[in-house]
A protein has these predicted regions:
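Membrane-helix boundary/interfacial segments in multi-pass membrane proteins
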Residues: 10, 125-126, 130-132, 136, ...
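Transmembrane-helix motifs of polytopic, lipid-linked glycan transferases
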Residues: 20-46, 143-149
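Membrane-interfacial loop-to-transmembrane alpha-helix junctions, especially the N-terminal start
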Residues: 58-62, 162-167, 212-225, 294-311, ...
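Aromatic-rich transmembrane-lumenal/periplasmic boundary elements in polytopic membrane proteins
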Residues: 58-129, 409-410
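Extracytoplasmic
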Residues: 390, 394, 402-568
Length: 568
C-alpha cells in the first residue's frame, strides 16, 4: 500500500518502484539507526568533564555501527555454521558443510529437524536480499520512525500531554500499524508505553513523583490508543479478522544451545548494560528511587527500555504463541518470526550504542583518562574490558559476512557493475515466458478499472504462478493457496475455488463453464504457459467460443468473455 502510494505520487511505473522500494527501505534501515544512535551518543557525551570526554568522532562511529548492525549484519548462526564449523571440518579432513542463505533464518526446528516445531527468525538483511516487500519489511522504516520520535519525546518531555505533538504523531503511526502490520502495533505499543512511563518518572523525579508520573503515563497511554483506533477506523469498519484463533501455550521449547547460537551474543552485550544501570541505584543516598531517575542520562534510560523490550520479545515465543493455520506443524513460527524480527532491530541499535561507547571509554581509561563507567559489571580491569569490547565489535562485524554470502548464493554470484540489467521487476518474464509477458503488457495498456481475470490458481514459491494478477494488479479468482488460507482461514471456500478454476480450463461442458464465469464475475480468461503446465489439455476451442480473443501472442491468448459480468 505504501509502495503504491509513493508510486502514484512520483508518477513512476510500478514495475520500477518495486525495486526502488526495496532499496528505499534498505537505505532507511541504515540511515535511521545511524541518526538515532548518533544523537543518543552525542547526548551521552554532553555534560562530561573535559577529562571524561572521548573522541569527537564517537557519535559517527556509533551511528555507523548501528546502521550496519540493523541493515547489513546477519546473526551468529552464520558465523558458527558458515565459518567456524566448515573451518573445523576442513582442518579435520571431513566433508565441508554447505550454507544456504535461509539457514540463518530457519534453524530452530530445521537443524536438527523437528516437524512439529518449525520456526522462523528472520532479520532485515535477509529480507532485503530476498526482495521481500511484505508488511514486516515495509514497516521497518516506520518502526524506526517511531523509535526516533520516542527518543525525541523523551529528550524534550515538558508540558501537558495534549500539547505534545509526538503523542499525536505516534498515535497516527500506531493506527497505520493496525492495518499494515498488527504485530508491530502490539510490539511498539508496549515500547511506547514503557518509554512514556520511564520518561515521566524522570520528568517528575521529585516527591511525590510516582503518582504524577503514573497519572500522566496512563493519560498518554489512553490518548495513544484512541488516536490509533481513530486513525485506523475506516479499516476496522470493513475488516473481518479470521487469521487469529487465540493464544496458545508453548509445549515445545527451543533447545538451549540453539537459543544461545541466535541470541547469546546480543544478550552478553546488552544484559551487562542493564545490570550496570540497575546497580547504580544503590549508589545514591538512602538508595532513593527518584534520585536514580533524576541522575540517569536520557540515552541510557531510553536504551534501557529498548534492551528490556528486545529481551522480552525473544523470550515470549518460549511461553506463548498466536494460534493460526500453522499450528499443527509450526505453532510458534509466525509469532517468533514477527517478534524476533523487531528484537533484532532493537538489539542492533543498542549493541552499537553500548559497544562503541564502552570500548572507547575503556581505551581512554587505559591511557589514564578518568572516564565515567557506562557498564561496571563486565570486567574490572580496563585493559581486559577494552579487549573484550574490541573482540565484541569484531564479532559484530563478522556477522556482516552473511550479506556477501546471501547475495552470492541468491544471485548465483556477486553482482558486477557491468552485469547490470534493469530496475524493471517484470523484465525476467520477457526471457522466461515472453508470450505471457507480451499478453501482460497488453492488459496493462488496454484494460481499465478492476475487471476480474482468470489465471491458474497459485502455489507458494513457484516461478511464475499468479504472474498475471501480480504484474497487472487485476483481481483473480484464487491467489497463492497458503497465503489465501492464512488470510481467510476458509479451506472449504478455497478448495472450491481451486476446483472451479480447473473446471473452467478443462471442462467440455459449456453451460457449466458459463455458470462459473457468471459466479465469479470473470471478464477475461488468460491462457498461457502456467495454465498449460498446471492443467494439461485446455479446452481452448470451447473457451474461445464463449467470448472474443482480444490478444494472441504465440501460444498465449486472452479471451474477453461475452457472458462475464464486468466488475469495474
Amino acid at each position: 500500500y505504501f509502495a503504491v502510494c509513493l508510486t502514484k505520487l512520483s508518477h513512476t511505473k510500478v514495475e520500477l518502484t518495486y525495486n526502488l522500494m526495496r532499496t528505499f527501505v534498505a537505505g532507511l534501515a541504515f540511515a535511521m539507526p545511524f541518526s538515532l544512535v548518533y544523537q543518543m551518543m552525542s547526548d551521552r557525551m554532553k555534560g562530561l568533564q573535559k577529562s571524561e570526554k572521548v573522541i569527537k568522532g564517537l557519535p559517527f562511529a556509533a551511528g555507523f555501527t548501528a546502521g550496519t548492525a540493523v541493515s547489513i549484519a546477519g546473526n551468529m548462526h552464520y558465523v558458527i555454521y558458515a565459518q567456524i564449523i566448515p573451518l573445523i571440518e576442513k582442518l579435520t579432513g571431513k566433508e565441508v558443510s554447505s550454507y544456504w542463505l535461509p539457514d540463518a533464518t530457519r534453524y530452530i526446528g530445521y537443524n536438527p529437524c523437528r516437524e512439529e516445531d518449525r520456526t522462523i527468525h528472520e532479520f532485515p538483511c535477509y529480507s532485503f536480499v530476498l526482495g521481500d516487500l511484505h508488511a514486516h519489511v515495509i514497516n521497518v522504516f516506520l518502526v524506526l520512525t517511531v523509535l526516533g520520535i520516542l527518543y525525541s519525546w523523551m529528550k524534550t518531555n515538558s508540558g501537558k500531554s495534549w500539547r505534545q505533538k509526538e503523542i499525536g504523531l505516534l498515535g497516527l503511526l500506531m493506527g497505520m500499524f493496525l492495518f499494515s502490520n498488527t504485530w508491530d502495533f502490539m510490539i511498539y505499543y508496549v515500547v511506547i508505553c514503557g518509554t512514556l512511563l520511564l520518561g515521566n518518572l524522570k520528568r517528575y523525579s521529585s516527591d511525590p513523583f510516582i503518582s504524577q508520573a503514573l497519572k500522566w503515563s496512563v493519560i498518554q497511554w489512553v490518548e495513544l490508543l484512541a488516536a490509533a483506533f481513530l486513525a485506523s477506523l475506516p479499516f476496522h469498519l470493513t475488516f473481518e479478522n479470521v487469521m487469529v484463533q487465540g493464544i496458545g501455550i508453548v509445549k515445545i521449547h527451543t533447545a538451549f544451545y540453539q537459543f544461545c547460537v541466535l541470541w547469546a551474543f546480543p544478550l552478553l552485550v546488552c544484559v551487562p548494560f542493564v545490570i550496570g544501570i540497575l546497580k547504580s541505584i544503590g549508589t545514591f543516598p538512602e538508595k532513593k528511587f527518584w534520585s536514580f531517575f533524576y541522575s540517569i542520562k536520557y540515552p541510557d534510560l531510553y536504551g534501557l527500555v529498548l534492551v528490556l523490550c528486545a529481551i522480552g520479545l525473544i523470550f515470549m515465543p518460549e511461553f506463548v504463541y498466536v494460534r493460526d493455520i500453522y499450528e499443527k506443524t509450526a505453532p510458534r513460527a509466525n509469532t517468533m518470526f514477527k517478534l524476533t524480527d523487531q528484537a533484532y532491530i532493537m538489539f542492533g541499535i543498542m549493541m552499537a550504542y553500548i559497544l562503541v561507547f564502552f570500548t572507547v571509554n575503556r581505551i581512554k581509561r587505559c591511557n589514564g583518562a578518568d572516564s565515567t563507567v557506562m557498564c561496571k559489571g563486565l570486567l574490572r580491569c580496563p585493559r581486559l574490558q577494552s579487549l573484550t569490547g574490541i573482540i565484541a565489535i569484531l564479532v559484530l562485524i563478522s556477522t556482516c559476512g552473511y550479506l556477501e554470502n546471501a547475495i552470492t548464493h541468491w544471485f548465483t554470484g556477486f553482482p558486477k557493475r557491468n552485469a547490470y540489467q534493469t530496475l524493471n521487476a517484470t523484465n525476467y518474464l520477457e526471457t522466461a515466458i515472453s508470450d505471457d509477458a507480451a499478453a501482460i503488457r497488453w492488459l496493462n495498456d488496454n484494460v481499465e478499472g478492476q475487471p476480474i481475470i482468470l489465471e491458474a490458481s497459485g502455489d507458494s514459491y513457484q516461478d511464475y504462478d499468479n504472474r498475471v494478477s501480480a504484474m497487472t494488479g487485476l483481481p483473480t479468482v484464487l491467489g497463492w493457496y497458503v497465503h489465501e488460507w492464512l488470510w481467510r482461514n476458509d479451506l472449504e471456500e478455497e478448495n472450491q475455488r481451486k476446483e472451479d478454476v480447473q473446471t473452467i480450463y478443462t471442462s467440455s461442458n459449456a453451460d457449466q463453464i458459463k455458470s462459473l464465469i457468471e459466479k465469479y464475475k470473470i471478464s477475461y480468461l488468460f491462457i498461457g504457459s502456467c495454465e498449460a503446465e498446471k492443467y494439461g489439455e485446455i479446452n481452448s476451442e470451447l473457451l474461445t467460443s464463449l467470448g472474443k480473443v482480444v490478444c494472441r501472442q504465440g501460444e498465449t491468448m486472452i479471451i474477453e468473455v461475452s457472458d462475464g459480468e464486468r466488475a469495474d
